[in-house]
Amino acid sequence: MKIISQDYLPVRTFILIGMVLLTTTQTYAQNINTRLSFTLKNATLKEFVKLIENSTGYSFIYGEEVGIRHKITLKAKEMPLHEVLDTVFKDELISYQFSGRYILLKEKKGQKPVSRKFTISGYVTDGTSSETLIGSNIIESHQHQGTTTNPYGFYSITLPEGETELRFSYLGYATETRKFTLSKDTLLNIRMQGNTQLEEVIIISDKAEAGAIATQMGAVEIPMAQIKNTPSILGEADVMKTIQLMPGVQAGVDGSAGLYIRGGSPDQNLILLDGTPVYNVDHLFGFFSVFTPEAVKKVTLFKSSFPARFGGRLSSVIDVRTNDGDMQKYHGTFSIGLLTSKINLEGPIIKGKTSFNISARRSYLDLLAKPFMPDDEKYSYYFYDMNAKINHKFSDRSRMFLSAYHGKDHFAADYDGNTDFKDGSNMGWGNTIVSARWNYIFNNRLFSNTTVSYNNYLFDVNTYTNNQYSTGAGAIILNRYSSNYHSGITDWSYQIDFDYNPTPAHHIKFGTGYLFHRFQPDVTTSVISDKTDNRIDRDTTYHNANNSRIHAHEVTAYAEDNFKIGSRLRLNLGLHLSLFHVQDQNYLSLQPRISARYQLNKDITIKASYTKMNQYVHLLSSMPIAMPTDLWVPVTKKIKPMRSHQYALGGYYTGINGWEFSVEGYYKDMRNVLEYKDGVSFFGSSSGWENKVEMGKGRSAGIEFMAQKTAGKTTGWLSYTLSKSDRKFTKGGINNGEWFPYKYDRRHSINLTINHKFSDRIDIGASWVFYTGGTSTIPEEKTTVIRPHNGANNGFLWYGT
């Protein structure tokens, strides 16, 4: 053997090894495209590697530093191997590389983990009755993020994947905690149990970055439990009386339920019953409100920085939500008070699916006074309210609510001196409201509510006089006079609202609506008849010149986003668009809403806001208390919409456990406000209401201080308001065109409310109110005008000043 032959041996060996390696590489290159079919659920990396190694000829090589953050869930059907690896390692800090029959796994360097986020959503309800809880607080302990339930008890919060701890709290309920690993979108419904030991509740609107209302200022949430514990006249718990005790809110006349908020008039308050406006909220000339306490679940008051979803009034929004009804068991209450009696019944129609809630109230002043009435004079007054609601749960995604309210005041006076002369009158006024609402959850981030409603307010007066006498010739003459006056407003509305949580940093609300108005401002009919021995001498019907109805159409749209900038600043930016069409006239308004909240530290917060509002309806009133003669009228070609610009700034301190301190200042500029002209009266004038009023402007400013104790056996609040409200009308008009104090301008106001709980059954409360007097203009002259006998308004007397 030659040496040369030995030299060729390594060469042949290398060639052979190379051919084998090349063949092997080609073989495994083909295996890359091997199609796999398998199903994995919550598998570990080790389990995944074993599956691939058994299904292919590859082996994995990786160090201890390589690991997966998420369990592997994958269903593959004829999927190439490289696509399987791409899918599994897409959101992991792992890279892979083929090397012959090996798959090398390496840790990605210099890259931050891709944090997946999932959404938790659901309803928060009472554990006993399944009643939804509005404004329940939800906070995540690790991320320090939170939210609140919306007006239908629904919440949605998006959090990073991993260990999660949610705390659910609500006034009067034991705090619920849920701990779990968040690895997917989760539906989590919470049933909270009542807690008679009213421990402190986490109010995240001031202490955490959560919820749309947290950014707004001038908002107060009042649970029904707080309203029932607030002292009131004659022991009747009343929604409006409780609101009167808040800073910035004035009462018209002592004891009445009228509201004058931050220098505004009563018609500038948007009062909603389950989302439907209520035009008359008073009984007994303002000493009671129309809201039966047993029917109410929660009340929210907005004095400034109104959310974009609200519009149509200048001064405030009062959102009253009623009870849905117990889905688990039947129960009820019956109570007898000094002036009223009430009954409330609720329970399941289909257990766990459908419930009802019915309440009724009636006064019995007429029954108490009847024994003391003289035989020839009869007076009667009473009022009543009826609420009914049906709540049906189609599924966790879909719910339907049907609501109805009817309330009325009735007054009658009859005189029957003898058989020849009789006269009398009766008045009735009240509301009828019917609404249907449908909640639907499109997904865990998008919630919708659709509302269709009917609303009617009517004031009706009937008077009559019968006079019968005999002539000297023996003829019997009968004179009869009767009249009917009525005014009112009827609304048909459609509204759809959406609640969207795209990311943890954004909470978006948007929607649109249509409202049809029918106004009857001033309708009078009079009938005069004369008979002689049953022979008709005259039978004439008169109508005033203002019997025409006014139809109006209102279209609205809005959008708002509550979002976070950095760790301290949160903004709420919104826009409300409204279009009002009446008498061939269009009024278009763009109303920006801006609110900001800056967290100086964990205890101190500063808020600021700007709000523009427009109002297309007016309430004409000449009395200091709520009267049925108050007239609702729309804007017209002559009467322009009211508008306002409000600026507010506030500071809040929550550093003392169980206490909250706040100070808020505001300035509001108002245009096109209405007042009756000097010397005019509502009754007895043949001219239309447009000729009785004049437009002007107003301004109000004030500062409000409040200290509130929210925890412990003794709770309550102390508030002080310093405010000023002025009006100015055209030169030559009211006060000769000079600025003058508004009739409900009260410079100083102090409210103190205290409640102490001795035990589960015994508690005591007290309230004290101090305010400076209002302003009033005293008439200097009185004139009596008697209409001609053959006039259209025969029988009316007009008293002017």
Task: Give the ranges of each region predicted by the language model.
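Short, acidic, small-residue-rich periplasmic hinge/interaction motif at the N-terminus
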Residues: 49, 53-56, 92, 98-141, ...
